[in-house]
Curated annotation (Swiss-Prot):
Keywords: Ribonucleoprotein, Ribosomal protein. GO terms for biological process: translation. GO terms for molecular function: structural constituent of ribosome. It comes from Leuconostoc citreum (strain KM20). This is Large ribosomal subunit protein bL34. The keyword Ribonucleoprotein applies. Residues 1-44 are annotated as: Disordered. Residues 1-22, 30-44 have a biased composition (Basic residues). HAMAP family: Ribosomal_bL34.
Amino acid sequence: MKRTYQPKKRHRERVHGFRKRMSTSNGRKVLARRRAKGRKVLSA
């Protein structure tokens, strides 16, 4: 059985990246929450 996580840089960026987060209102909420929490890394 193959493993479920087969990492790809492009997919990671496109699905979880900063620009993807900024493109939707809910994504911006995610970033705002992570800023409020003081996360060093906001997105992939």
